[in-house]
Amino acid sequence: MKICQLTNTAEKQAVTRSILEALPEWFGIPEAREDYITESGDKQFFCAYDADKPVGFLYLKETGTATVELYVMGVLKEYHRQGIGRELFQRAKEAAGKAGYSFMQVKTVQMGKYEEYDRTNQFYLSLGFQEFEVFPTLWDEWNPCQVYVMAI
């Protein structure tokens, strides 16, 4: 497995599309998925490869002068629980620190709503994120937004 930082817009968008379309349990709303794909082009982007096959990615989005958000992350289901997400995160966290950011945040659906997102919440907690705030209607009433934060 190798982790690379991508800079080519078309390549970032192709990787984002291929992985998000394979994860409908998390990225099943077409409009939101297309927004993630479009936005990936100008973000700090990391990709995990198994040989030449992209199997996971994440990208960061600046939300303030001192804060960056782990904006979207996806790993193909057959590659879950192999440490790929953790490796992607470590590379991104290291890059964010070198870029001068002091904090990282991530948003997901609040624990206790959906099994898939409960696993996502547990993953973020295992990385060292801490609960910050829940916005009950930021996305909609069925998907309360949990914000996690960490110091870099």
Question: What do these predicted regions represent?
Answer:
Residues M1-E31:
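Short amphipathic alpha-helix that is part of the acyltransferase structural core
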Residues K43, N143-Y148:
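Short hydrophobic/aromatic beta-strand or adjacent loop that forms the aromatic wall/cage
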Residues C47, K53-K61, T67-G74:
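Conserved beta-strand in the GNAT
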Residues M73-R81, Q110-G112:
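A short, internal acetyl-CoA/4′-phosphopantetheine-binding micro-motif in the GNAT/acyltransferase core
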Residues R81-E94, Q122:
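Conserved acetyl-CoA-binding loop-helix of GNAT-fold acetyltransferases
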Residues R86, M111-V134:
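Conserved active-site alpha-helix within GNAT-family acetyltransferase domains
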Residues A96-E115:
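Conserved GNAT acetyl-CoA-binding A-motif
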